[in-house]
Amino acid sequence: MMTVESQELSEQLRWTDLPQWQQLQQWWQQQSQQHLVQLHTDLQHQLRENGATFDPWLEQQRQLDLMPWLVSDTQWQQLQAGVKQRQLLLSMVLQDLYGPQLLIQQGLLPAELIFQNKNYLLPCHQLVPTHQQWLSLLAVDIGRDAAGQFCVYADQSQMPAGLGFVLEHRLAFNHCIGELNHSIGKSQLAGFFRKLQLVFAQGTGHTAEGRRPLCGLLTQGKRDAAYFEHAFLANYLDIALMHSADLMFKDGALWLKTVTGLQQVDSLMRYLPDARCDALELDPDSTGTAGLLQSIRQQQLFCANPPGAALVDSGVLLPFLPALCQALLNEELLLPTAAAFWCGQPEQLQQVLSDVSSYRLRRIDTAQSWLWTELDVQQQQELQLQLQADPTLFIAIRLLPLSYVPCWNSTQGEHQQYGVLRLFGLLSEQHSPAVMPGALARISPDAQSLQHQ
């Protein structure tokens, strides 16, 4: 018998009243087992053909499940409003922390939490002009808590991976199971990507009249496990795929080396770690383009997102977001955050230590992250010693129980696994905020490891 708690965490039970679920069930019952197996095989083949999900370092490649994740219109409106608010809030926080730092002066954020953070980059102070948004792109990872409510457990701004996967998955579904997509009325993604193209084309607004803006996607290259996603996304957006070695700084701007000479770069979609972007001002051992920060500083380059944004990814803001939202927006946080604690506060440290296996621990000066249950006894003892030696260096984020979603593949047939969603937001001073009308859904039999990936 299904318990009350498990009912709260069953996505399928939430779908029973949706007309899309009725359409899906009707379609499902019309398919033979053999045809479902063939459709699943065709989906995986289509992914291999497109290439975005290819990872040469993985023995087992990603699989696309045959069952879509349904979200009601009411639920989606709530998620959309929450992501828009969150992106604006985080952008304002970064603008302050890399600017006047009033949030620290007013005691809303502890100074040691920010300045000890590996992802807080001093060279990025006053990097972005006040009229521009710090976070043009944001990925928000959500899952359900014990009450069945969606909560954010992580934000991704440094390299918000997954846009290419969502796009590729939708194209594969349209190609292989177009009639199902049509019957359940999936929202179209094209409008979001057109707006993304427009934001990059407008860049800083300083492009010389008559010159077509040059936009690029900056990647580490083939050694990056996500390189094929980068190539797929750049091709779809009709922007150049660039590497640091392709670029040079000259006359206050960033230039692309081509066989016909130098061409000024106006906008970059950055999929390169913050510290590896500029060998002059950031990591001198990296192959980053010297002068990249200066070109942003001089408003000759629009970068999404600029180096320094990874402070958001470190999780240090999570314990303070409700108070920050009240202070900066005079609003309640629309999309709640998983319970998070800064261990530099004694009462919060004791709360974490009393139930440490229920948390994901992050060390802010090294960006290391641990799940207690994945450590052996010696590793647990070593981590506990680190935690007690300097608790100000640790953030603890409570693990969510997560909901389980119906799945189907050719090897297991119909079954259920834990699931999370990654949503994507777009923010620009020229346009109204936008949330991609879809999400990257990930599933796993292990709820904890899913939140740690």
Regions found by a protein language model. Give the residues of each.
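Preference for protein termini
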Residues: 1-453
